[in-house]
Amino acid sequence: MFECIICGDFGCVWDGSTGDNFWLKWLDSLPWNTLFIDGNHENFDVLNTYPVEEYKGGKVHRIRSKVFHLMRGEVFNIDGYKFFTMGGGFSHDVNYRTEHKNWWKDEICTIEEAKHAFETLEKNKWEVDYILSHDIYSSHP
């Protein structure tokens, strides 16, 4: 099966509305798996309620049978290639947003996530074929 990878700001896991369900059902009907890393515009309160599973060597939130959130600091083996994932980013407009409504602190990588990413890369001898990210961090933990 083919994989379609979206690099952040997925937008289909927001509030459980009929709009979310319409698009997730549509994505699930396609002849490929939809994989995404988180961006800085995600509803992390909802996203983090999904079950964590292993998929192609890394941890994911399974959203639907063919829709997966590739979690931060993981390496996935897809079609013979290693993909390292580091989602998130910094919202430049945070001063105009409301926490837990349209902005979440979880958009920024935590120290624990950074440590996990380094450990994962160490286990893979710092050899991956692709790095998937959404945004460049202006700072790090």
Residue ranges and their predicted role:
Residues 1-78:
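Core catalytic region of metal-dependent phosphoesterases/phosphodiesterases
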Residues 65, 79-141:
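Active-site-proximal loop/helix segment associated with metal-binding centers of metalloenzymes
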